[in-house]
Amino acid sequence: MLDILKNNWSDAQIVDVSYQKGTLLLALKDYQNTIHKYLFENVIALSFENYLNEDISEIHSSFWKEENDTICQIDILSAWTNKEIVSFSFFTH
């Protein structure tokens, strides 16, 4: 299981999304104001809306096979609108 999926992220916020050359750095701040940073490599798709200071309701994941590769998609939902504020897909190892 991915580390990001092990926590309950309700009342957390996205504080940074940085993308460069197929690598995504995602920083989340939990309700105790602790910053958690996650690095994802081999990112093949990324979309986001205005996410700063937006509370998270939950994080969804899905996995599927494409030829010989496994792909994971992560969707982060807004607590206010329940819509995706960040979504990305990447090849897993």
Where are the regions that the model predicts?
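Surface-exposed, interaction-prone regions used to assemble/regulate multi-protein complexes
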Residues: 1-93
